[in-house]
């Protein structure tokens, strides 16, 4: 994943804060999902979703004065990190009319552009509606249905997990009065520095407004944690990517020591910003995923991901299956010379990095073992976004831009390099959307029929 948080273009006044406002009631849209014990034996869970606090209107605790407008902090309310956290509150959300988020039973639809808002990021809440639902992915299987038929080049309808705190960080950082109810506590392997509040304090100090996005900027601090990208996709390309970190929990970083695409040294932090990705097109299989292909993105599909452990209980393999039109379809096999298989293993990742000439940052952060410890408690995230850093070329086009398209690993999909420029995709495809539904979780082979 490339600079996920910075790349979101949010509502004009979107901001992360640590106080809870009272001007708009916060009501989480309901979303059901299923917990399974064996094939055909699943129990419905009554959950809900909450939008990330970076999208919310944030204002003075005393009135409706904005704490943050465009990509600039109010100098009076926010002269420094601690004062800003005390002075500012984030408020409730109107999910459909402001953010284009709707639910229906077990289905969640995210619309791309709604008024001045672009994209969204949401978390699954637990049945109490007080904290995030957490999942232990080890020796488990996660399955969902997805419709990407309305996601053109340059967009990313993502479903992934990170090692966020279940309460949004409220217990660790008492200054955070908003907590999970208001979508606080985000972290990922990019150690995002565009978050307006981290660990109960604002990110005002050192804040630099973005040069190409009127709504975002970068502060001195970032928020790091392991990340498991189960699904990053549009109708052209898809990628499955684990990202390890040196710590299994959320940590705050500072400046260029954060690494990732927010910093001068991409690989200077404690996490792997690139991960070990399995994109069928990048692995040399250009007939597997897309409109009219083996996995036909013109129709809804079921996506199955299995997390296999070794004898010691540590993650050793990530396997992928699809179910479409009643057929179970194994993941595409690699067609890259020197790289074999259709699942993510240590051997696959080592061979892939060598074949593509990539720095093996994955191994430097302990590879699959580096994410395994975090997988006992991860939070589910569902989002739709466009990319102000690399126009989503890393997912669906040729990347890096100056590389030769025929070199191994450069071609990620068939999209034109200009198709994902945010101004282009926002102007041409504002009504794009993604729908996630029928989420199931349980032991291996419990969430789908292998003989479908």
UniProtKB/Swiss-Prot annotation:
Q: Which InterPro entries match?
A: ConA-like_dom_sf (IPR013320), Glyco_hydro_7 (IPR001722), Glyco_hydro_7_sf (IPR037019)
Q: Name one Pfam family in it.
A: Glyco_hydro_7
Which residue positions does the secretion signal occupy? 1-17
EC main group: hydrolase
The record's section on SUPFAM superfamilies has:
Concanavalin A-like lectins/glucanases
Which residues does the Swiss-Prot or TrEMBL record annotate as the active site? Answer: 227, 232
Recorded E.C. number(s)?
3.2.1.91
Any one cellular component term from GO for this entry? extracellular region
Per UniProt, subcellular location reads as:
Secreted
**Record bears the keyword Secreted:** yes
**What are the BP-aspect GO terms?**
cellulose catabolic process
- What main location does UniProt list? secreted
Q: Which reaction does it catalyse?
A: Hydrolysis of (1->4)-beta-D-glucosidic linkages in cellulose and cellotetraose, releasing cellobiose from the non-reducing ends of the chains
Q: Which UniProt keywords apply?
A: Carbohydrate metabolism, Cellulose degradation, Glycoprotein, Glycosidase, Hydrolase, Polysaccharide degradation, Secreted, Signal
As for what it does, the entry says: The biological conversion of cellulose to glucose generally requires three types of hydrolytic enzymes: (1) Endoglucanases which cut internal beta-1,4-glucosidic bonds; (2) Exocellobiohydrolases that cut the disaccharide cellobiose from the non-reducing end of the cellulose polymer chain; (3) Beta-1,4-glucosidases which hydrolyze the cellobiose and other short cello-oligosaccharides to glucose.
Q: Which family does it belong to?
A: Belongs to the glycosyl hydrolase 7 (cellulase C) family.
Protein name per UniProt: Probable 1,4-beta-D-glucan cellobiohydrolase A
């Amino acid at each position: 994943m490339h600079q996920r948080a910075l790349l979101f273009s949010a509502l004009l006044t979107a901001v992360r804060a640590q106080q809870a406002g009272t001007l708009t009631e916060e009501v989480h849209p309901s979303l059901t999902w299923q917990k399974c014990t064996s094939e055909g034996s699943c129990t419905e869970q009554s959950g809900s979703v909450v939008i990330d606090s970076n999208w919310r209107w944030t204002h003075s605790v005393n009135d409706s004065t904005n704490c943050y407008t465009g990509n600039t902090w109010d100098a009076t309310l926010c002269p420094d990190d601690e004062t800003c956290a005390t002075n500012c509150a984030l408020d409730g959300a109107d999910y459909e009319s402001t953010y284009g988020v709707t639910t229906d039973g077990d289905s969640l639809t995210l619309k791309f552009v709604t008024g001045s808002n672009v994209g969204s990021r949401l978390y699954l809440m637990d049945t109490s509606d007080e904290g995030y639902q957490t999942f232990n992915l080890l020796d488990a299987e996660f399955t969902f249905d997805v419709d990407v038929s309305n996601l053109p080049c340059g967009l990313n309808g993502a479903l992934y997990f990170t090692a966020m705190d279940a309460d949004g960080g409220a217990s660790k950082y008492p200054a955070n009065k908003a907590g999970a109810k208001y979508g606080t506590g985000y972290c990922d392997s990019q150690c995002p520095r565009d978050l307006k509040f981290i660990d109960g304090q604002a990110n005002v100090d050192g804040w630099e407004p973005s040069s190409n996005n009127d709504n975002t900027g970068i502060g001195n601090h970032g928020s790091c944690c392991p990340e498991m990208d189960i699904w990053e996709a549009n109708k052209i390309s898809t990628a499955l990517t684990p990202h390890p970190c040196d710590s299994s929990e959320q940590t705050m970083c500072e400046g260029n020591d954060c690494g990732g695409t927010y910093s001068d040294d991409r690989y200077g932090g404690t996490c792997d910003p690139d991960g070990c990705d399995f994109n069928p097109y990048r692995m040399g299989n250009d007939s597997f995923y897309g409109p009219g292909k083996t996995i036909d993105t013109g129709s809804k599909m079921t996506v199955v991901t299995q997390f296999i452990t070794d004898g010691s209980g540590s993650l050793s393999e990530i396997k992928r299956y699809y179910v479409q039109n009643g057929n179970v379809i194994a993941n595409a096999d690699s067609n890259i010379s020197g790289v074999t298989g259709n699942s993510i293993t240590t051997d696959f990742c080592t061979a892939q990095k060598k074949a593509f000439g990539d720095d093996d940052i994955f191994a430097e952060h302990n590879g699959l073992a580096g994410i395994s410890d975090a997988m006992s408690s991860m939070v589910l995230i569902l989002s739709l976004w466009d990319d102000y850093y690399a126009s989503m070329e890393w997912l669906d086009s040729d990347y890096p831009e100056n590389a030769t398209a025929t070199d191994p690993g450069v071609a990620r999909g068939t999209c034109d390099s200009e198709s994902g420029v945010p101004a282009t995709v926002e102007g041409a495809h504002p009504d794009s959307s993604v729908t996630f539904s029928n989420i199931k979780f349980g032991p291996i082979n419990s969430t789908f029929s292998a003989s479908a």
